[in-house]
Amino acid sequence: MRSFFLLLLLSLTSIVNAQSLIGGKNILKTNLSSDALKNYNLTFERSLNRFMSVSLSYRKMNKQKLPLKALAKQFIENPAIDFDDFQIGNSAITAEARFYLGVSKMSGLYIAPYARMATFDLTVPFDYTYSPASPTPNVTLPAIPMHAELDGTIRSTSFGVYTGMQFQLLTKLVLDLWIIGGHYGTSNGKLTFVAPNGTPALALNELKKTIDQTKTAPFSLTTSTTSNGVVTDAAGPWAGIRGLGITLGFRF
């Protein structure tokens, strides 16, 4: 019986050691779920020991029309915003540490705390009207339709944790499934509109009133007029869900 357990222990040790060496200590991978939304990303992960690794990710989405308009309308309420021409782009750097609960290096169930810095490039179009001043008393001139596009960036810093499972499919091929997690932090930014020459001050004041009607709780917007346009400062908490990701990688 003792010989049997000794043989079993030696066999398990050999399996663990063999698995820990399969493919190498590094993995280069991309999230296929994110790629499908043209939000391209690349992650480099390196094993520190059997139970821990560190990784660094970069993602980039070129500016494009808003991909999830229905969802955005739930968080940004203003009938003057033209969501059909709303544009967004983003880039982010994410650093994380992974703690694997299995017996193989960079394989099995894991828990991963992470930190993320992101930048969002926005173009927010507004359609509004303003009534010009009448040179004749008691005469109201018809309202003039106007269009303005606010451009700028929002930057966020957040921290979170998520869980997932990573599988060694082949000697060099890895499948990483993000299950569920999330992050929380802060954000701030500025959007500006530079008016064409000759734009009346009344039109800029009306644009400010239109922007002030935007409901973006829990974010706060502070808008002011300038000599040639409008500036909107944005600030507030930043939260997000991380999960349901399918990532494929090359191990070396």
Residue ranges and their predicted role:
Residues 28-32, 44, 54-57, 95-97, ...:
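Membrane-embedded beta-strand positions of outer-membrane beta-barrel proteins
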Residues 98, 238-252:
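Outer-membrane beta-barrel "beta-signal"
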Residues 19-21, 40-55, 59, 98:
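Feature captures outer-membrane beta-barrel proteins of Gram-negative bacteria and organelles
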Residues 30-33, 63-92, 120-156, 184-243:
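Extracellular/periplasm-exposed beta-strand and loop segments of Gram-negative cell-envelope proteins
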Residues 101-123:
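Ordered, amphipathic secondary-structure segments that act as subunit-interaction surfaces
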Residues 20-36:
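Short N-terminal segments immediately surrounding and downstream of signal-peptide cleavage
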Residues 1-24, 248, 252:
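Bacterial Sec-dependent N-terminal signal peptides
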Residues 51-54, 105-106, 171-175:
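Repeated loop/turn-to-beta-strand initiation elements of outer-membrane beta-barrel proteins
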